[in-house]
Each structure stands twice: as structure tokens, then as C-alpha cells.
């Protein structure tokens, strides 16, 4: 049975030409469109812009979700994912049976298309060889160019800190509609009320538009070249709900990944531009989660 039957929703799943995320755990053939040469296709047949999909909300399933969680974590951490023991992190997520939510479209035994959970970083930080300690060191190192956030990372996640910080992990396939997110956060709010967190730290991603080396090799004129020497690329959210979270955050900021990504050159995204992904952290007081959820429900109503 679904985790919250009342939360089951039908939404149009947006189709996308950008195959940005790794969906290797899915059967590619089952998602491949018919070939234009297929004689069964009519000449005037059009591919629909949206497809109605029933989304169901479930608890994490130890027997089914392990590999899909690993894939989604790799998407979230991008090119730096190889720096962490994602098997340990996946196991940690699955062990929290009463905390966190997955979204599936084909019943409990199918792979999740989205996950949301929180991990008590303060509980695991003293295990110096563990994945949480590695993430803490990573966050401290990557935020050195973000002084206020860096200061809070050292203060709240340091060895002598008594603050209880929950790491919120949220990731989904790129064509999942944002309207599925508020119910997940509402359930997380209910599930964490008795855990007495002081702060939540959201691990996410943003991106900027970056000119690709392929364009440079082709010597094509680029819009970016017309911006002038003082041009600073605009930052965009992968997850629209992050804008709501950021409004309530005490500190936040984007940071460059340690390992360079080839995503922009391989995808030729936005035609003349590539996508330059970067990590993003948002820190907010736990008491503000209720207000965040309330605004999400308004901003992203079904």
C-alpha cells in the first residue's frame, strides 16, 4: 500500500530533450520513442508534450530501493560523487524506516523516481571514517569562498558542537513535476517533529550557463561574448522549491565541484550554452520548516 494514500497524485510528467540525469537503472528500451522510420507511425503523429502519470508515495524499501538511491545520490553529488562511499550513505538512508519518502509510478516493488529524507549529521559525525564525516569535511572545504556559510559549517558541525543538524537529501529525475514535492516535505515535517533538530542543511545543486569548448572550436558567435568583460552568469535552480527554502535560510551559497564536469560539452544544452552545474547548500532553522512547507503548498499547488 502507498505510504499516504491520500497523497497519491496524478500529474503531467514533463517530457525533456535533456537526458541530464543518470537513469541507467531503468530499462532504456521501454522509454525509447518509436523510430521515425517505424511504418506503424502516422506521418502527422506528434509526440505529446506531457504524459499523465500517477505518482504514489512510499516509505523506503530495503529490498528494492538500494540501487536507485545510489543513482540519485550520484546525480545529486555530480562529478564529486566518486569522493564518497555512496553504498554507506544508501544503507544509512534505508535504515531509517520511519523517516523519508520515495515516489514511484508502478507500485511498491518498482524503482523510486524521487527521494526525500533527512540524516542526523550530529549523530554520525564522530565516526571519522564514515561518509557523514567525509561530507562534513567536504562542505567545510567547498564553502571557503562563502565566509558566512563556511563559518556556520565549522561552528555547527565541529567536534565540540552540541547543535543537532539534519542533512536533507532530496533528488528526483529531471522531468518530475515540482508539484510532487510539497507532500514529501509535509511528511518530513511530521516525521521530524520529535527529533528536536536545531538546523536543517539542504544539499542541492544549481547551475549557470557556460559556453562549451565545442562552440569555441567551431568558432561560433556566442551570446556570452556579447555580455562584456564584467558579465557574471546568472544562477538557476535545478529544483524550483529551493527558491522557497532559500528565502528562509540563514546562510546559503553555491560552490564549484572539485572535479570538472564534461556535462556541458557532451549535452550541448541550450544550443549555444552548456550547463555548468555546481553544488548548493542552504542552512535554515528547524523551526522554519513548517513555514517553508506552507509556502511550498501554495507556490506548487497541484
From Swiss-Prot:
The keyword Manganese does not apply. Residues 16-46 have a biased composition (Acidic residues). Its main location: cytoplasm. Pfam families: BCCIP. It is found in: Cytoplasm; Nucleus. Residues 1-13 have a biased composition (Basic and acidic residues). Residues 1-46, 211-232 are annotated as: Disordered. InterPro entries: BCP1_family. It comes from the Eukaryota. Keywords: Cytoplasm, Nucleus, Protein transport, Transport. GO terms for cellular component: cytoplasm; nucleus. GO terms for biological process: protein transport. The keyword Nuclease does not apply. PANTHER family: BRCA2 AND CDKN1A INTERACTING PROTEIN, BRCA2 AND CDKN1A-INTERACTING PROTEIN. Involved in nuclear export, actin cytoskeleton organization and vesicular transport. Belongs to the BCP1 family. This is Protein BCP1. It comes from Yarrowia lipolytica (strain CLIB 122 / E 150).
Amino acid at each position: 500500500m502507498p505510504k499516504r494514500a491520500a497523497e497519491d497524485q496524478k500529474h503531467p510528467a514533463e517530457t525533456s530533450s535533456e537526458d541530464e540525469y543518470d537513469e541507467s537503472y531503468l530499462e532504456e528500451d521501454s522509454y525509447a520513442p518509436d523510430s521515425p522510420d517505424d511504418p506503424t507511425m502516422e506521418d502527422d503523429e506528434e509526440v505529446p508534450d506531457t504524459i499523465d502519470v500517477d505518482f504514489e508515495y512510499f516509505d523506503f524499501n530495503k529490498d528494492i530501493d538500494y540501487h536507485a538511491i545510489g543513482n540519485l545520490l550520484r546525480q545529486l553529488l555530480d562529478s564529486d560523487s566518486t569522493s564518497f562511499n555512496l553504498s554507506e550513505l544508501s544503507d544509512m538512508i534505508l535504515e531509517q524506516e520511519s523517516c523519508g519518502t520515495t515516489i514511484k509510478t508502478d507500485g511498491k516493488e518498482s524503482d523510486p523516481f524521487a527521494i526525500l529524507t533527512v540524516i542526523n549529521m550530529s549523530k554520525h559525525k564522530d565516526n571519522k571514517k564514515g561518509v557523514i564525516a567525509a561530507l562534513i569535511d567536504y562542505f567545510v572545504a567547498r564553502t571557503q569562498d562563502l565566509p558566512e556559510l563556511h563559518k556556520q559549517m565549522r561552528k555547527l558541525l565541529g567536534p565540540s558542537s552540541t547543535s543537532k543538524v539534519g542533512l536533507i537529501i532530496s533528488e528526483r529525475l529531471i522531468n518530475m513535476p515540482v508539484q510532487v514535492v510539497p507532500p514529501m516535505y509535509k511528511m518530513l515535517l511530521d516525521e521530524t517533529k520529535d527529533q528536536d533538530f536545531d538546523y536543517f542543511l539542504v544539499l542541492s545543486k544549481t547551475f549557470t550557463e557556460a559556453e562549451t569548448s565545442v562552440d569555441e572550436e567551431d568558432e561560433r558567435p556566442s551570446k556570452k561574448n556579447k555580455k562584456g568583460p564584467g558579465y557574471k552568469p546568472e544562477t538557476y535552480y535545478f529544483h524550483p522549491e529551493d527558491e522557497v527554502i532559500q528565502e528562509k535560510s540563514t546562510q546559503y551559497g553555491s560552490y564549484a565541484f572539485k572535479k570538472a564536469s564534461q556535462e556541458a560539452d557532451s549535452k550541448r544544452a541550450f544550443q549555444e550554452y552548456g550547463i555548468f552545474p555546481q553544488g548548493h547548500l542552504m542552512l535554515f532553522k528547524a523551526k522554519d520548516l513548517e513555514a517553508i512547507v506552507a509556502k511550498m503548498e501554495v507556490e506548487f499547488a497541484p
